[in-house]
Amino acid sequence: MEADEFEWDDAKAAANLRKHKISFRAASRVFDDPLVLIEQDVAEDDGEDRFLAIGRVEGVLITIAYTERDDRTRIISARKANNHEQRAYDHS
């Protein structure tokens, strides 16, 4: 995916960087992982389909939550993958 295919809320991106030490720009590269695992995010139900992408960025396994809006990928959050996500990725 190209960088201009992504969008996010700048305040949310700054808060995410402070909390998780992962920028949304770097996190967008999760889709470059040929083994990226994409699942529907069933934990959130605010009327908008959300997805989780689990993949490696610079050797670190991360999980991003995102949605699709008007042919763009809107990143909602990004963090290091938890143990459950690590196992799902390893077994995919």
PLM feature spans:
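Ribonuclease/tRNase effector modules and their secretory precursors
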Residues: 1-92
